[in-house]
């Protein structure tokens, strides 16, 4: 924190579907870039370690194992860093697979948050692969050698701020998890997302984030999936947005084919 401000960032890596080792290397490049810019909290898109569009490959244990190996590599890479990094990955629990955000700092897992609302209509079929946190009920999982509880609503406290996490479609729920998180004391909301792009959807999303950041009286950092995701059924525009109290502070260049 400097002069009462917290520098946050939304990093959109160039990824390869179902290639966690490549993806973690791209995320590491973004971390170094963010570190040079003094970023204190960096959020990446939904399922950034594996790619969002793996589809039935999420059922393969090999992919889940490779994602965990990639996370361990990222933990080693960030061991000497004060920056908080949030990445997305699938995590196997007692009743299925959870779509999770993993919070890292100084080489340690600070917490795991699972997605609440799984879109399952039109072009989306997340319930085919994932289980909502509503059904998991705060299960404990072994990840990278540690027994960690998967949470639904957690406020992470740092010396400079407090923040909470929601994922993708959670924002569009009648009562988003971020509303509860704000009432629990979260000053900043991080959203790991992989919302597909449609005509007019970008403007709709901006309005939703502006309204929610104003309603929560805080900051909102949105990182959307981008280049490298499969375009078989969907299009991703790598949208990244930062809002505060209903006002936009930063927005990236959409449809960029490079990491940013």
Predicted features along the sequence, with ranges:
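Enzyme catalytic cores with a strong preference for nitrogen-chemistry domains
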Residues: 1-260
């Amino acid at each position: 924190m400097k002069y009462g401000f917290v520098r946050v960032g939304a990093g959109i890596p160039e990824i390869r579907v179902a290639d966690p080792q490549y993806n973690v290397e791209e995320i590491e490049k973004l971390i170094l870039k963010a570190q040079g810019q003094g970023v204190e909290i960096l959020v990446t898109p939904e399922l950034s370690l594996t790619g969002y569009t793996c589809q039935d490959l999420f059922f393969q244990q090999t992919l889940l194992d490779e994602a965990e190996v990639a996370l361990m590599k990222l933990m080693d890479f960030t061991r000497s860093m004060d920056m908080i990094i949030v990445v997305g990955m699938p995590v196997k629990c007692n009743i299925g697979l959870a779509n999770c955000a993993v919070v890292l700092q100084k080489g340690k897992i600070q917490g795991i948050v699972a997605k609440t609302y799984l879109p399952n209509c039109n072009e989306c079929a997340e319930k085919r692969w994932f289980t909502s946190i509503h059904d998991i009920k705060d299960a404990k999982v072994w990840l990278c050698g540690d027994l960690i509880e998967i949470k639904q609503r957690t406020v992470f406290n740092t010396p400079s701020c407090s923040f909470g996490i929601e994922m993708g479609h959670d924002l569009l729920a009648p009562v988003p998890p971020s509303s509860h998180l704000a009432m629990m004391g979260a000053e900043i909301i991080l959203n790991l997302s992989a919302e597909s792009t449609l005509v007019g959807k970008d403007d709709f999303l901006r309005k939703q984030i502006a309204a929610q950041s104003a309603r929560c009286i805080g900051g909102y950092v949105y990182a959307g999936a981008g280049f490298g995701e499969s375009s078989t059924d969907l299009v991703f525009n790598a949208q990244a947005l930062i809002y505060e109290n209903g006002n936009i502070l930063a927005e990236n260049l959409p449809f960029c084919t490079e990491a940013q």
